């Protein structure tokens, strides 16, 4: 979202040097040879954030969630929306209800769009993995990329998006 004026929830009136809100989250999902799912999540945080703000990344259910029998999900973007919808948990629960990893991500993003008011002002991306190795990825806007790695190698992908 380089050069955009998307509201990332920072303190009003503060503009980073260069005019960009440089921050992002790295979410990792893995499925081992025994079929066990795991996830991890780290974030650089948001520039000019409100003092004491806790983002979604460390909150189980918002930024990261795993149920070994159902699936795993991670979320990046505007943490307030991820927390409000319990995004990663929502994705895994959609999978529990029969949705594919992709369908679950799309349904969770649809719910986020419904509550945001103006989805053009926010970005959230979701990544999900099923115990069978099926991947889902979806975002509100373009620009959400993810990497897949397996014994055949690594490849970058751009997630589908709603707007």
What are these regions (language model features)?
Residues 1-163:
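N-terminal nucleophile
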């Amino acid at each position: 979202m380089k050069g955009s004026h998307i509201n990332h929830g920072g303190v009003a009136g503060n503009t980073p040097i260069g005019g960009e809100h440089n921050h992002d989250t790295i979410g990792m999902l893995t499925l081992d040879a025994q079929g066990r799912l795991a996830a991890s999540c780290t974030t650089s945080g948001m520039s000019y954030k409100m003092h004491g703000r806790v983002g979604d990344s460390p909150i189980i259910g918002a930024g990261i969630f795993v149920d070994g029998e159902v699936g795993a999900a991670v979320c990046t973007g505007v943490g307030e929306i991820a927390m409000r919808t319990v995004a990663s948990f929502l994705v895994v629960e959609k999978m529990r209800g029969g949705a594919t990893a992709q369908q679950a991500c799309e349904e969770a993003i649809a719910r986020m769009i419904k509550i945001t008011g103006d989805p053009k002002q926010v970005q959230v991306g979701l990544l999900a993995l099923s115990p069978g190795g099926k991947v889902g990825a979806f975002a509100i806007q373009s620009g959400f990329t993810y990497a897949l790695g397996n014994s055949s190698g690594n490849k970058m992908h751009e997630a589908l998006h709603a707007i």
